[in-house]
Structure formats: structure tokens, C-alpha cells
Amino acid sequence: MKRSLILAFLLIAQPAFANHPGERIDEVMTEQEPAFEVMDRPSTPDLDVDEPGGNVLRLGGLHDQIIVLSFVPQNCDSPCAKQQAVLTGVQEQVNVSPMKEMVTFVTVHDADASIKATWDEANWRLVIPSNDETTAAAANRFSASSDRGQELPMAHVIDRNGRHAGIFHGSDFSKTNLTLYINGLINNAHAPKPPTEKGWWGWLTGLF
């Protein structure tokens, strides 16, 4: 029943974006969601993280996925806990649709920071920074791209080709807006394009 209600709600909300081509998704979301900030940068800062057991997770290895990246530094407490709870709600909306196979949520935390939110591990990765870096340092590297204050935790949305698409600040944003933004990215013009075969001129110039 809950699954059906979420799907119905998303279908009702979707027309708000239906008349907007993919290249306008940032403009539309800026109008609808005060917590949203456009990034539109070709790449993200470096991030070296390990999964439980010591396996290295590379964001580049998820190039075919939309990534929702968040940070839970030590002593972040309530602000981060609230954001994690909202993000699990977004995951729930995503996972009742085919988007589940196209979206990965990544939470970076310090080893002694607790994550109380109930995530679906099917498309959620919990990681810690590599090389003795702190989560706060990694979060600051990402937040440096923002033109807003850094008091609130940020959820970074990374497009399938590694483009740093946008940031959702804090925990007061609409879960449905983030879900619709993810859906828009899945369908928009920023998706990776298949390689094209070289023509004779490209083949000739390639010799030099």
C-alpha cells in the first residue's frame, strides 16, 4: 500500500517537470526548492574512501549511477542525523521505481560516528575516509564549491558522468524535490554519450 501511495504521489508531482527540457532542470529546481544550489561542475573534488572490510570505493567506479553523497563528521550530531533521515526517505521513494538500479547513496562517516537512519543496503554504501583523513576534512573539500554558508550538512548530487550537478543543503528540503531532480538527471542531456566512430579526417589527423 505504501509503495503504491509513493508511486502515485510521484506521478502527480512529475507533471511539474514534464514541460521542462533536461537542460532547464537546474533552473526549475532552483525555483521550487530553496535548499537547492546549482553546481554544474564537470567533476567533483577527490575522495578516497574505504568500505567495511577495507575495500576501496571509487566514485569513478559508479560512473553509470547517479550518486547522492553525504557526510557525517564526528560531533555533527542532530543536523547530520536529520539529513540522513530525510535522505533515507528519498531512497525509499527512489527504490519503489526503476530508478533503484540507477542511483547509489553514499554516506561518508568517521569510524566512531553513529548512523541511526534506516538505510536500504541494496543501493547504499557506508564508507570511511582513507589515509587517516577525517570526514570533516573531506566534507570541507566538497563544501568549498558552495557559495552558501557551511553551517548545514550538504547532500551532493553527482551525475552519471561524474559531473557535480547540485547540492541540497540541510534537512528542510522536500524529499520529493530531490527524487524528481534525480529522475530529471537520469533522463536529461547530461547523460554520457556513446563514443562516435572517427571519420576519415579524424583518422588522418590522428596519425599526427
Which positions does each model-derived feature cover?
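Structural microenvironment flanking redox-active thiols in thiol-disulfide oxidoreductases
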Residues: 82-138
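Short loop/turn microsegments at loop-to-beta-strand junctions
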Residues: 44-45, 67, 152-154
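Short active-site neighborhood of thiol/selenol oxidoreductases, capturing the structured segment around
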Residues: 58-87
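Structural micro-motif
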Residues: 122-125, 136, 140-156
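Hydrophobic h-region of N-terminal signal peptides that target proteins for export
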Residues: 9-18
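Thiol-/selenol-based redox modules, centered on thioredoxin-like
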Residues: 149-208
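Sec-dependent signal peptide recognition
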Residues: 2-8
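N-terminal "domain-start" segment that seeds a small globular fold
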Residues: 22-63, 85-86
